[in-house]
Curated annotation (Swiss-Prot):
GO molecular function list: snoRNA binding
The protein's name: WD repeat-containing protein 3 homolog
Stretches with biased composition (Basic and acidic residues): 912-942
Keywords per UniProt: Nucleus, Repeat, WD repeat
InterPro entries assigned: G-protein_beta_WD-40_rep, Quinoprot_gluc/sorb_DH_b-prop, Quinoprotein_ADH-like_sf, SSU_processome_Utp12, TBC1_cilium_biogenesis, WD40/YVTN_repeat-like_dom_sf, WD40_repeat_CS, WD40_rpt
Organism annotation: Dictyostelium discoideum
GO biological process, one term: maturation of SSU-rRNA
Subcellular location: Nucleus, Nucleolus
Amino acid sequence: MVKAYLKFVQDKVFGLISTSNSILDGSGKLAITGCGERISIWDLRKQVLNQSLYEEDIKAEVTNVCLSKDGALLASGYSDGSIRIWSMSDYQLQAVFNGHRGSVTTMTFNRLGNILVSGSKDTEVIVWDIITESGLFRLRGHRDQITSVKLLERSNHLITSSKDGFIKIWDTETQHCIQTIVGHRNPIWGIDVNPDETRLCSCTSDNQIRFWRIPSNERQREDGSGIEPKFIVNTPINSAVIIPDEINEDGSKKENSNNSNNNDIDDLEIISEEEFAKYYGSITVKAESVSGVRFDPTNKILAVQSTGKFVDLFKITHYDTMKLEEISIVEEMRHRQTIKTSSKVRFFSFGNDIKHWNKFVITLAGNSLEAYEIKEKEQGGGAFEVSSTLDQAGHRSDIRSLSLSSNDQMLVSTSSESVKVWNMKSLSCIRSIACDYGLCTVFAPGNLHVIVGTKTGTIEVFELASAARVASIKAHEGSVWSLVLTPDLRGVTSGGADKLVKFWDFELIASQENSKHKVLNLSLTKTLKVESDVLALKYSADNKFLAVSLLDNTVKIFYTDTVKFHLSLYGHKLPVMCLDISDDSTLIITGSADKNIKIWGLDYGDCHKSFFAHDDSIMQVSFIPSTHHFISASKDKRIKYWDADKFEHIQTIEAHHGEVWSLAMGSVGDFFISGSHDRSIRIFNQTETPIFVESDRQREMEQTWEATLEDDTRMRTKEMLEENAAAGKQTLETIMAGEDILDAIELCVQEKFKIDEYEKLLKTTKNQDEIPLYQPNIIMLGLSPSEYLWNRINRIRPSDLEEALRVLPFSVMRTLFEYFNLWVDQSGKSVEFIFKCSFFLIQTHQNQLSVSTEFIPILQHLNTSIKNRLQKERFTLGFNRSALSFVKREIEINQQYKFFDSDLYLNKNNKNNKDKDSNNNKKDNKKDNKKDNEKSLKRNRK
């Protein structure tokens, strides 16, 4: 029988504050940001985590978050190209979209929140329908990562920017590019459009912010059709291109410019005969390089984010519209003030709500957030203040070492700037102490002190009660790479880059501040000189041996009592970064930078097994107490579970998004903790769920195969070179969903055949008592074939439906269309769903259907039935809409305020403060409205 092991699963994640962009909610009190594969919602006032949104099976990192304008929906983009929609009312997952083949870099909602536009590293833009949970279309044209997308809803246009240096303006109705703005010499890091949709600004890797005029409402056609139509012209490559540096401020091209010979411009598909956006001018900022621009919701402030520690605020001056053409952009955008942050600015965002326009949040590169509020002064100008700072819940840099207390109640972690102590129950940081670059750490016996070895060669002792450094000892000339407690708990042993192993005993000395107070200190007892730098140390549990890993790729075994040489373990091609000894002192495992793990016998030093374990350097190995199972961690971001007796790989854990530097094993072995370059600390618990090695290998093979389904390196077909395309993407889930439909169709065909045969038998047999009762297929759960197939198709996620139907072969199309005819005649079935499926299948198999005569009557009947059903649905919707309009007018008449007007509705108790003129005209207006309502009601009845 195959041996089953118990599975380790990730339980909790902490230490992360922000790894993606951050946004404010409508109230301005909550900050929403990505933390690894989770979305964290922080309470800015209390500085605590309010909510965490995630799915158990998500492994990809959150790369972008976006909130709808009304704050009802939250979209999160991931590094695997997927997008998830969450409800902000109950924090539940609403929809999942799969369409991108690279990380999602930017997203935006429309004003109603029913359309989402996303851009990705795969150079493509996809427009999604939130209501139907499906993709509308895909836009291609950029040659590098999409950096920003903006919707112009008043004119049905979409603006995109990319690292290829181009800004493209798309017509969302024709799904084609109508203008390409070129001339940026560097990648475009961001664009933004003001709330009035009259200004477009862009930023790149220089100190210039460039602006373009967008036609305003006054310049749009009076018939309400939006911007005047422009013909889309496929201009040859050598055609003239409008470049910002060669344009006059009035939008005309300079006479001496000759863009057709510009070497920076190639392979462009341009532009309409008349440009939609016209160059306006540019302003200069103090920073050498700019990485982001943002308008506030009220169009009062333009914020410019630099690549350093600065955010510049520009005040937008609003002039009379008649003089708009006469002013320059420098006069319109006036520098107001500069905000300097504590570390490098990573992202910047205003809130969506106009009421809180003066609040914004800055995501810093050091795993922290800062919330600001702009304060208006009485005499012009303005000031700002930091309203909240989130930095205590995580480290600013990599987590280099972890150590658990003896009772597993506390955890200590070190990084380049501090030592943090965590409560393992609440996962809150209870102590944060400034420290040099900590490379290793241990708890002193009693769990009242923490000992840290630093990169500068000192050993520092911290008292947890006072959160103070009580001792700092210059132990080594180089970095202290390893620090371990002696098995008798009387001292510690350190190994450093100065080729020395030093043995220290604990002692209590009088405090310098208070002579009566005793503090912990270390006294040197002996020193061991070795041939090379010491990288790792480990005592055997029986206190007989000390294993020392050296920079010369070997491991030396010494006797603990006499410090005499015992064995030398050699065979690694690169230095041994970590090692561990089993509790029974029989096995020693070594992990090296050569990506191999070796299992040795501690008695004779023989190598039991050597195997290629990871794809990068192995940083930590640790035995599970009282077993020969061990955990390894590597710079390839993976953690692996092994059996040292059978030399078997049991489980691979892919949880971190950066190099895994450290491990801490629980005292019983039922859990372990890992720390990583991504600044996260993760707890993995051992469950009662058995894991079978062979089944786990099969699952890994499926994941590898899925990764090849949409490979960016594959040949680009003619369809992929078109500007617009379908939004779906083939995944393992869509293939399995298509196979599920195919299995259901085959089962329904077999069951239908059995039912027909049974009915024939009933008709031909005189004595029906001799015929046994029909036994339906138990898999169908007592449903008819039609109902069973309907349920199976409806179970598929709407965003995966089209790709699942694409898997079906043409041989089952006749059966499927016959069921469509059956369903469309039933009132309980959704005609929209039937139409969507049938229309997609007809488009997919158009060539075969056009030459097949057997489908003609089926499709004709389906066409007629769908038209009739849609006509009925249209009549029902029209009647309901008219009835709702009538009810709405009645409410407005009776309650004296407009329906859905939140401000008037909330202030309905202040009706007596209204103008006297409106009260005098109330009766006349009511009579006129009643007459209009009666006329509309008669019209609707007809």
